A protein has these predicted regions:
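N-terminal secretory signal peptides
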Residues: 1-79, 91-100
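Sec-dependent signal peptide hydrophobic core
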Residues: 81-89
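Short, glycine-/small- and polar/acidic-enriched structural segments
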Residues: 104-252, 261-278, 284-298, 439, ...
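Sec/Tat-exported extracytoplasmic proteins
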Residues: 162, 167-170, 177, 204, ...
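Ligand-binding pocket segment of bilobal, Venus flytrap-like solute-binding proteins
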Residues: 163-165, 254-286, 307, 339, ...
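Short glycine- and hydrophobic/aromatic-rich loop-to-beta-strand nucleating segment
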Residues: 200-201, 303-306, 310-311
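Secondary-structure end/capping motifs
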Residues: 314-419
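Conserved C-terminal helix/tail region of periplasmic/extracytoplasmic solute-binding proteins
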Residues: 395-468
Length: 468
């Protein structure tokens, strides 16, 4: 038989090798060709003057918004001190040299060959697509994006300095920095990778059992203890009267194994990342019970981050990484790019999923597994802002469910790890009248408002918890 065909062997595929000569299937070949064409189109779009201007403004606006969560505060500050003084004040509080360094200047890079880890899920879209679209190389970086099997491995490789930066679950840098589950190692969240983009998926056998009050005894999967998935699932169950520690079982399952566990009947459902919610529908083993945006619209999920040591030793390299990932997020936010992005990130070296599955997730036009086609444009989005109030909420849930014991300095931890600095201190230094209290935005989860200035009061409102 030739190296391409083996038509009379029952134990081998008919077509052994692609006609291009490479050792992959024709289907993989077509996916790669489509991905290359889509990447070329997106690269061309990224090089237009229109996108260059949009991207630059997006990055700078993101940085300024980090310091001024409230629009009126930003306007008052600028009117009071003027543009130049404001830029100087802002520059002094950013985590790298200056606003211009973050937004446009390219200082000498301390390190150019970098290894960045990722889990193959759509949450990592900005980090992944920056590679084939050339956003890293445009910043002078030679980046290897490395597919990783699970979150514990991501944690260990960051602690052991095998990765320079990584795709994190957004609560992970908090947990790692505090020494929860591993030796304490200071980590930072540079940007949120995605908002929304998760779902509660149930086995098809439960399609007539949609009321969570009836789920006592269910077995659920989540990707990691320190994940928004775990915290949101626990929140949802508790709001419906179930104790997540005694009335159900919650198991840690790597995202790539969730659909197989659902198919095998090992779990009744999971709150997990896409594309695996949509893949369960695609494989006809599950249905989408609820998008997490319906629990908390705009909630964070994953983050892009690195160690505090890396930032301190490589400030210009970190700034270059920051620019590359924010440029990618700017492109991912534009709905007109989503179908092309699905082609770029679906092949084997990235997500290894059917393009149709990824496209449904990113465009928000999807089959729900119950016979309906849904149209939810903001099913997944890419807002990079690491609000410190998000970190405070995560810390409240860690305390609520017994992951943290004793007193918690919420504000100090949030401001140390999530790289946004409150502008109020610098307004005061400039002689401006400053309202009392931290300038964190408020959030609404299942109809209940969360005020990051009052975390302990918030915790006292919950009847179901694991606090002493």
């Amino acid at each position: 038989m030739s190296e391409f065909f083996d038509p009379y062997n029952a134990d081998r595929p008919l077509m052994l090798k692609c006609s291009c000569g490479r050792d992959h299937s024709p289907a993989d070949h077509h996916a790669e060709v489509a991905a290359d064409a889509a990447a070329a189109t997106l690269r061309a779009r990224s090089e237009t003057a229109e996108f260059e201007a949009y991207s630059q403004e997006f990055i700078e606006a993101t940085l300024v918004k980090a310091l001024f969560p409230h629009e009126q505060e930003r306007r008052n500050f600028l009117r009071a001190v003027g543009k130049k003084t404001a830029m100087a004040a802002i520059a002094s509080v950013l985590p790298v040299a200056s606003l211009q360094a973050m937004a446009e200047d390219k200082g000498p890079l301390e390190k150019t060959n970098l290894k960045i880890g990722f889990i193959p899920i759509t949450c990592a879209t900005p980090l992944i697509m920056a590679h084939p679209l050339g956003f890293y190389s445009k910043q002078g970086l030679n980046v290897e994006v490395t597919k990783t099997a699970g979150w514990a491995l991501i944690r260990d490789k960051m602690i052991n300095k095998e990765y320079d930066a990584t795709h994190f679950l957004s609560p992970m840098p908090l947990a790692i920095s505090m020494g929860l589950g591993a030796n304490a190692t200071p980590m930072n969240v540079a940007t949120i990778q995605n908002v929304n983009g998760q779902a509660i998926t149930l086995s098809l056998k439960h399609k007539d059992n949609r009321d969570p009050k009836n789920w006592k005894g269910f077995k659920f999967g989540v990707p990691f203890d320190y994940s928004m998935h775990n915290f949101l699932l626990r929140y949802y169950l508790a709001e419906n009267g179930l104790n997540p520690d005694t009335d159900v079982q919650i198991r840690v399952i790597p995202p790539a194994e969730m659909v197989a566990n659902l198919r095998a009947g090992n779990i009744d459902g999971f709150l997990g990342p896409d594309p695996f919610n949509q893949r369960a529908v695609f494989d006809e083993v599950g249905f989408i019970h609820m998008l997490t945006k319906d629990l908390w619209n705009g909630h964070p999920c994953c983050a892009f981050g690195t160690s505090t040591e890396f930032i301190q030793k490589n400030p210009n390299t970190f700034a270059a990484l920051y620019r590359a990932v924010l440029t990618s997020a700017a492109m991912a936010r534009l709905p007109g790019n989503r179908e092309l992005i699905a082609k770029v990130i679906s092949p084997t070296q990235y997500l290894n999923q059917p393009e149709a599955v990824i496209s449904q997730v990113l465009t928000g036009k999807f089959a729900d597994g119950l016979g309906k086609i849904q149209n939810v444009p903001d099913r997944a989005d890419f807002d990079p802002m690491p609000w410190q109030s998000l970190a405070v909420w995560m810390l409240t849930q860690m305390k609520r469910w017994g992951y943290i014991k004793g007193n918690v300095d919420y504000k100090q931890i949030a401001e140390k790890i999530f790289l946004i600095t409150d502008a109020r201190k610098h307004m005061k230094d400039l002689g401006q009248t400053v309202p009392a209290g931290p300038s964190y935005i408020k959030h609404k989860i299942m109809g209940k408002e969360f005020d990051a200035a009052k975390p302990e009061e918030y915790l006292k409102t919950f009847a179901i918890h694991k606090m002493g």
